[in-house]
Amino acid sequence: VKEYFRQQSDGQFTPEFEVVGPVTLSKSYKYYGEDGAVRKDVNIDYFYSEACKLAAQQLADWSDFDNNGDGVVDFVFFIYAGEGQNASDDDDTIWPKESVNSTSVQYDDKTITFAAFGCTNELFKGKQDGIGAMVHELSHALGLPDFYDTVGDAFGLDYLDIMDSGCYQINGYQPCCMSAYERDFMGWKKLVELAPDTACSL
């Protein structure tokens, strides 16, 4: 994941990670992954808050993850055991996602507030999952939207875009590159507007 972003940004962004865990939550995956009438994973907020409280007890200092100094942890990412709903026939599994939803947890007279979360699955169709879904969800945290049709069956760039189905190339082990638009959006590669008489070679 670190190398993916380093390459896509031409060395301008190299994320660093602190791995904490594993932790075991109090309920089964079906509780956290249960779908409602209009929303997937209606209890996902309980997943986040419980996992954050358990993780917070394993890491003494969270200040390194407060980039702007506002006293809030900017982002936490979870890899949960088993399959995700993106590749499972079980509707009660959790769908990989990024969520902006401030949550505070308390333990030992301490309060830690988290601004946003992301999560993805450990397994993909019975095998160890690659990095594609994690890269996709982290890209949401950086500001990129989905570029697949979230309400219908229209095709976009499909497997040619990391924010579409490109995160699933070779089961996530070889996610596609970011598009020129996405790199421009991130400020990593400025798009050049071509005039009608501009000569270009590919």
Please place each PLM-identified region on the residue numbering:
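Extracellular hydrolytic enzyme modules, especially secreted metalloproteases
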Residues: F75, A81-L202
